[in-house]
Amino acid sequence: MGRLHSKGKGISSSALPYRRTAPSWLKISSQDVDETICKFAKKGLTPSQIGVILRDSHGIAQVKSVTGSKILRILKAHGLAPEIPEDLYHLIKKAVSIRKHLERFRKDKDSKFRLILVESRIHRLARYYKKTKKLPPVWKYESTTASTLVA
């Protein structure tokens, strides 16, 4: 499947391990992993940042193989999940930074065009998240209030 607003095909991906069980050399329990995830979430890290830290410094390649549930589900169980999904949050952040750039450089036509593309992606994702009930049905992206969502 190709990218939405570019020519890229997106064929690169990491290979998942064949076995879906925790490795035998991993001596950490699922409760310890839960506590670690909650500790990082309280520091303000996103679920993907938590996964990178667990992979790089704790040796946990897949949280689901150790605990039986994914990082976001663990965060939801403890009430620490972000109110806006992470990919939508980063798109809003990108749109805010492009708008800030356009305030300084009003004639930057390419940035205006890219802002239109980013905002159309935001609307498309928001429609999907409303349909799957991850966002409230009255949630709406507005460029004027977007900086408060990101800050």
From Swiss-Prot:
Q: Which GO terms describe its molecular function?
A: small ribosomal subunit rRNA binding; structural constituent of ribosome
Q: Which InterPro entries match?
A: Ribosomal_uS15, Ribosomal_uS15_arc_euk, Ribosomal_uS15_N, uS15_NS1_RNA-bd_sf
What SMART domains does this protein map onto? Answer: Ribosomal_S13_N, Ribosomal_S15
GO biological process, alphabetically ordered: translation
Cellular component per GO, a single term: nucleolus
Q: Which UniProt keywords apply?
A: Ribonucleoprotein, Ribosomal protein
What are the disulphide bonds in this sequence? Answer: none
Show the PANTHER family listed in the entry.
RIBOSOMAL PROTEIN S15P/S13E (PTHR11885), SMALL RIBOSOMAL SUBUNIT PROTEIN US15Y-RELATED (PTHR11885:SF25)
Q: Which family does it belong to?
A: Belongs to the universal ribosomal protein uS15 family.
Q: Please state what the protein is called.
A: Small ribosomal subunit protein uS15
Q: Which organism is it from?
A: Pisum sativum
